[in-house]
């Protein structure tokens, strides 16, 4: 039986989602828990592998089990055992051919920034602090330029190993908040550090160091040296995972280009 688990976590005290030889990770917490229940190792398969310090409002993973335990009991047992910075929101059964990674057709990230004259220790780890004034309207116009299908070679980590760096963004916008702004981006998928590089670039636009018209040229150049900065992990949230193609079409229209992970 294949089980799908929806979770949320605060990333401050994790080295990321993926298991590491030394250090606390989200995958480690769940596989340790499942091993106690099954008396053997059980591997989990996530929809996304968030980096160190990145939070998740909605994340999924699946695992296979031969235990006949009601779904409500799975959720209760997990939440009773897990630490305070992880929570299981839902547990359901899925078809045996379902795969969390390959059936994911889209993801939405939110990057949170607060602006003030001085740093707020109660925001630390949850939002990124920027004291300088920023031109949010200009940043939003630049953000809109990323919507569509592009090669994001110049906007991801040079450690990115995937061959194709073409991704489709359905949403890319700056939203003003009471204490700063959020950058919201939804796409078919994201490259290593891509969202944090986009945020860092948009902040440079807001400071007047780049123009809106630079975006097409930087995309075409495919050179990371032209966009050298990466925003901190602390303000980044994995906000939504799209496992249903119809949900993505409902949010962004029937004319969008749908990608499946096996085609990326």
Swiss-Prot record:
Keyword Cell division assigned: no
Binding site residues for substrate: 109
Reactions this protein catalyses: uridine(38/39/40) in tRNA = pseudouridine(38/39/40) in tRNA
Superkingdom of this protein's organism: Bacteria
SUPFAM superfamilies in the record: Pseudouridine synthase
Gene Ontology molecular functions: RNA binding; tRNA pseudouridine(38-40) synthase activity
Active site: 51 (nucleophile)
Record-listed E.C. numbers: 5.4.99.12
UniProt KW Chaperone keyword: no
Any one biological process term the GO annotation gives: tRNA pseudouridine synthesis
Keywords (A to Z) from UniProt: Isomerase, tRNA processing
UniProt-listed InterPro entries: PsdUridine_synth_cat_dom_sf, PsdUridine_synth_TruA, PsdUridine_synth_TruA_a/b_dom, PsdUridine_synth_TruA_C, TruA/RsuA/RluB/E/F_N
Family membership noted in the UniProt record: Belongs to the tRNA pseudouridine synthase TruA family.
Function per UniProt: Formation of pseudouridine at positions 38, 39 and 40 in the anticodon stem and loop of transfer RNAs.
Self-association and partners: Homodimer.
Protein name according to UniProt: tRNA pseudouridine synthase A
Organism: Staphylococcus aureus (strain MRSA252)
Upper taxonomic lineage: Bacteria, Bacillati, Bacillota, Bacilli, Bacillales
């Amino acid at each position: 039986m294949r089980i799908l688990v929806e979770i949320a976590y605060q990333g401050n005290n994790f080295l990321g989602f993926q298991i590491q030889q030394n250090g606390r990770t989200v995958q480690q917490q769940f596989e340790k828990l499942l091993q106690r229940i099954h008396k053997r190792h059980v591997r989990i398969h996530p929809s996304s592998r968030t980096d160190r310090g990145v939070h998740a409002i909605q994340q999924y993973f699946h695992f296979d089990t031969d235990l006949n335990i009601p779904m409500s009991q799975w959720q209760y047992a997990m939440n009773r055992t897990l630490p305070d910075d992880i929570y299981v929101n839902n547990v359901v059964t899925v078809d045996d051919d379902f795969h969390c990674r390959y059936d994911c057709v889209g993801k939405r990230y939110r990057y949170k920034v607060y602006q003030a004259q001085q740093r707020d220790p109660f925001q630390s780890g949850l939002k990124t602090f920027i004291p300088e004034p920023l031109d949010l309207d200009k940043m939003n116009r630049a953000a809109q330029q990323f919507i569509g299908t592009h090669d994001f070679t110049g906007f991801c980590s040079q450690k990115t190993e995937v061959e194709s760096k073409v991704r489709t963004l359905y949403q890319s916008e700056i939203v003003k908040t009471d204490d700063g702004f959020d950058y919201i981006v939804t796409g078919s998928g994201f490259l290593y550090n891509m969202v944090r590089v986009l945020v860092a670039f948009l902040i440079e636009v807001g400071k007047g160091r780049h123009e809106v018209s630079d975006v097409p040229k930087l995309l075409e150049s495919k050179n990371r040296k032209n966009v050298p900065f990466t925003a901190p992990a602390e303000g980044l949230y994995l906000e939504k995972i799209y496992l249903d193609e119809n949900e993505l079409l409902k949010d962004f229209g029937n004319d969008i280009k749908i990608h499946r992970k096996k085609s990326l």
